Structure formats: structure tokens, C-alpha cells
Amino acid sequence: MILDDIRDAIARADSEAFDALLNAEDSDLNAFSLDALLGMCVLAAAQSQSRNESRHQLEIGRLLVARGARADGPLGNERLLQSPLVMPITSLNDSDEIVAWYDLLIGAGADPNSISEVLVDGFRCRMLMLSRVCFFFPVTVLITTEDRFELIKILLRAGANPNPGVCDRALDLSRYGLPHSAAWALDDAVARAPELANDEHYVAAKRLVKGVIAAGSYKKYLRLPLQELLNLLSLAQRGKFATTDPVMKSLVGVDNHVVWNVFTYWVES
């Protein structure tokens, strides 16, 4: 049965065989769930102890997403695996692949604000994915602090809420209770591992999270420097600010809306 062959190819991390099976003339893609196969692939990749196998699992994941597989449903037990985003950060393999998995799964619809449970001092604590990633900052065996910071940026770009419960209508607080914030998770991380206070990626992550909370959103946070530039530009255009910078001089005669659009494009791309 072709479905059994496909499952076997996923388990063996045989991306070439998997691709051939998907493209076979007798392969009926409607006979099975691509979403379920993607979930199976994520689990297999996280449990694999071979980096080579894990890389092939990632390639299989990309093939499934290219075929239309979605990652917007729970992966397993609702309390512990609310999102497929939980599994890559438990992987035994290369942290670069964890980042690639996050890019792939979020692009396929994985919810950056999904809730899962984390054991903290023997108690089950509810955390959004961003808080969970921040909480485990001290764990550097499987993922570098640089790549963990990259995961934080990916989640924030996708709309992750660093401060749950504050103007967040998407959270069912009656069902889950108030999850821990990303700021709390970062503070708790450095309390458990004081050396993080001198880690440039931890410091950058904390500055980013606090900046996003203060600004109200990741997009607003990114635009703060642009707004400051426009404020200076406006002063220069009105003759209240003198500059020797050639770039600023060239911008004085350009409409502010044009300047804003150009710099916003550079930042977001």
C-alpha cells in the first residue's frame, strides 16, 4: 500500500524515495492527510539521533509543505504538544535545522501563539512558544544562544505575543489561565544561569523583547528608528536642524512618505 511505503520513507528519512512515491502515477494524495504526514515528519526529525537523517527529514518536510501540507493543528497531546513548534526545540541534532524547521512550520501556518506546558520545579506551567524558547536559554547543548535568538526573532516576526494577557483576545484565559510572559522567562533564565548576563545574544534577545512590549508590536518596534529619522528630517526641512551627513542632505528634498516607504522596505526585507 502506497501510504505504508510513504510512512516507511519518512521513518527511514529517505527523501528521494519519498519524492518518488509522491510523484508516482498511482499516488492518490487525497487518500491520506498531508498535514498528518508533516506532523509525523516533525516527530521523526526530533527523535532522530543522526544529523544526516535529520537533514533528510527536513527535506521531506519541505516537499510536504510544497504539496500543500499545513502545520496549523496540534501535533499530539493537547497539553504537552499544542504545536508542532515544540518538537524542533527538543531535537538532538543541528541547531541550524531547528531554525530551518521554524521557518518552514510557521510558513505552513503553525501558530506562534500556541500554548504548551513546561515542567518548572515540578509544576506544570503554561507558556506560549515565545516564552518557552526564552525559558530554555540556559540549555546550550542542543542549540546555540545565537540560534535561540534567531528563533525569538522568527516568532516575533510571525506575531508572537511577548506579553500574554495584555490586550490579547486570542487567548482563552478561562481555559488555560494566564501564561508566563517572555520577559518573565528571560529573567528566570538568567537567574538560573547568571553567565547569560554576559552573553551577547541573550542581552540582544532581552532588549528586543522589552522593546517590542514597550512599542506594542514587533512591526512598531522596527519602525522606531525610522520615525526618529523622519523627525530629524522634518527638522532639517524646516531649517531647525543642520547636518553634514550627505545622505541626510540628499533626503531633505524628498517627500517624507517616500522616505518612510523606502526605509521600511529595507528593514522588512
Where are these regions (language model features)?
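Ankyrin repeat domain, specifically the short helix-to-loop turn at the C-terminus of the second helix
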Residues: 19-29, 59-71, 100-112, 150-162
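Cullin-RING E3 adaptor/co-adaptor recruitment helices
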Residues: 171-269
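Extended HEAT/HEAT-like alpha-solenoid repeat tracts in very large eukaryotic scaffold/adaptor proteins
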Residues: 53-60, 101, 105, 125-133, ...
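Ankyrin-repeat intra-repeat helix-capping/turn positions
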Residues: 13, 45, 49, 56, ...
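Ankyrin-repeat boundary/"N-cap" motif
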Residues: 2-8, 30-49, 73-92, 115-142, ...
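Short helix-adjacent coil turns
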Residues: 9-17, 200
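Generic preference for well-ordered alpha-helical elements
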Residues: 3, 15, 82, 244, ...
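Ankyrin-repeat helical core positions
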Residues: 10-11, 22-26, 42, 46, ...
